[in-house]
Curated annotation (Swiss-Prot):
Listed transmembrane segments: none
Family statement drawn from the similarity comment of this UniProt entry: Belongs to the universal ribosomal protein uS14 family. Zinc-binding uS14 subfamily.
Protein name per the record: Small ribosomal subunit protein uS14
Organism this protein belongs to: Alkaliphilus metalliredigens (strain QYMF)
The keyword Cell membrane appears for this protein: no
This protein's encoding gene: rpsZ
Subunit-level organization: Part of the 30S ribosomal subunit. Contacts proteins S3 and S10.
Cofactor remark: Binds 1 zinc ion per subunit.
Length: 61
């Protein structure tokens, strides 16, 4: 889990656009962020298994 201070720091508008970075909307994790869904890989997996992300299912080939 991300520290509360880091979540607040990221939410503020930065002076320069290159300083902005994405965080997971659920847990606040900055790495392995999936832009299309707005969550990190761990939260994405949990939501997909619960069926809360429409159109996503486990792949098999």
């Amino acid at each position: 889990m991300a520290k509360k201070s880091l979540k607040i720091k990221q939410a503020r508008t930065q002076k320069y656009s290159t300083r902005e970075y994405s965080r997971c909307k659920i847990c606040g994790r900055p790495h392995a962020y999936l832009r299309k869904f707005g969550v990190c890989r761990i939260c994405f997996r949990e939501l997909a298994y619960k069926g809360q992300i429409p159109g996503v299912r486990k792949a098999s080939w």
